[in-house]
């Protein structure tokens, strides 16, 4: 008994992928150049999240449903422009992640105002402020004031104080005080409690990422993508031939840049999850490419008389159904996440969808066709070597 199958991609297709490679390469160059230009900070830049830019992330739970837009407006009205508010966890929990790009309320002007106010009342030996910490000013006195008097002086400068902590002075005969100012958590928590009193907001978790740590995370993330690409090139070279590696590295670079374009052009937040997307796209892209390369290797042994261009075109057509259906099935699951996903999950799904489309395209038009281009260049270079030596032949003949 034979079963009838429904083929989305019919057998025996004869699309000329190799013949269209020049158009595809020009199109890819334009798209990649546009993404890279738009991602330059001086032109537009990526919207780095708290993970990479540094800042404060708060998880807040409400007892009743609250609109994310209303929370965002409330936070931005406090002076935190560009605040990100996303739903977190199950919808029934009414939990949100609030991200702001600052780890402290105090800037340079605030610190100067506080120091001037304290110095106007007490003889300060020295003071220090670490912007990486952002909410603590250290004062050292020979004749220390009482903690209450110091707190009153700081609050008189318009800065709320959470704690004044006495510490041992650095020099003999001195006394230090660490003034801990009210931070972002207290300000946002107080504001939410005022505007959403009936919803009973509860701060579950607060995380701070300093700018230096954010830069380090960002650099390490991009390094991880580059290391993954390098290992993939080595794998392809060992499994097939290192002649195939340039095509692979160009294809996965193409896919990573196109996926990056989703974050660059939409302005969506680029964070550690985005790095995970790039790594996933790179791995997914090379999977399709390996399928085509396997078929090329088989067909090279099978069709000795055919040129590499003919074998590549034949191999892509023979694996067309498999590569298309694999990508199509994955895309269907991502569409479901796009419909029901929010926040980070939505961005992950959307960027993955862009990467899968790009990966399928690069498998057909970039990876294998670029291998042909490198082979043709190598053949021309090899052919030009005897030609360069040809003028010496007549001289040898004359000597005979």
Describe the role of every protein-language-model region.
Residues 1-400:
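A structural signal for conserved, well-ordered secondary-structure elements
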């Amino acid at each position: 008994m034979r079963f009838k199958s429904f083929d989305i991609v019919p057998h025996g297709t004869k699309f000329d992928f190799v013949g269209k490679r020049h158009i595809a390469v020009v199109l890819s160059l334009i798209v990649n150049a546009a993404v890279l230009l738009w991602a330059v900070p001086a032109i537009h830049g990526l919207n780095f999240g708290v993970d990479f830019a540094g800042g404060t992330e708060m998880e807040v739970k409400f007892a009743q449903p609250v609109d994310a837009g209303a929370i965002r407006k409330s936070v931005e009205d406090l002076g935190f422009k560009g605040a990100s508010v996303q739903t977190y966890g199950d919808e029934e929990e009414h939990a949100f992640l609030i991200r702001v790009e600052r780890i402290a309320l105090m800037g340079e002007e605030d610190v100067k105002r506080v120091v001037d106010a304290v110095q106007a009342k007490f003889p300060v030996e020295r003071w220090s402020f670490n912007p990486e910490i952002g909410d603590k000013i250290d004062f050292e006195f020979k004749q220390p004031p009482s903690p209450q008097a110091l707190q009153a002086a700081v609050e008189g400068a318009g800065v709320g104080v959470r704690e004044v902590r006495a510490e041992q002075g650095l020099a003999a005969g001195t006394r230090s005080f660490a003034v801990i100012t009210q931070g972002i958590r207290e300000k946002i928590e107080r504001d939410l409690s005022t505007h959403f009193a009936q919803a009973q907001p509860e701060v579950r978790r607060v995380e701070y990422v300093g700018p230096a740590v954010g830069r380090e995370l960002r650099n390490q993330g991009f390094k991880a993508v580059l290391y993954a690409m390098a290992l993939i090139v080595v794998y392809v070279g060992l499994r097939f031939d290192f002649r195939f590696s340039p095509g692979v590295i160009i294809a996965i670079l193409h896919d990573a840049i196109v996926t990056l374009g989703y974050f660059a052009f939409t302005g969506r937040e680029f964070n550690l999850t985005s790095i995970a997307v790039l790594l996933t796209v790179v791995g997914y892209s090379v999977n399709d490419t390996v399928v085509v390369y396997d078929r090329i290797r088989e067909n090279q042994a099978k069709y000795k008389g055919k040129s590499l261009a003919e074998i590549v075109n034949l191999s892509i057509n023979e694996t067309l159904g498999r590569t298309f259906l694999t990508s199509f099935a994955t895309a269907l699951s991502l569409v479901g996440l796009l419909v029901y996903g929010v926040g980070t999950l939505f961005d992950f799904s959307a960027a993955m969808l862009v990467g899968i489309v790009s990966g399928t395209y690069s498998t057909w038009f970039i990876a294998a066709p670029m291998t042909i281009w490198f082979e043709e260049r190598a053949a021309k270079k090899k052919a030009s070597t005897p030609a360069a030596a040809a003028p010496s032949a007549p001289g040898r003949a004359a000597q005979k």
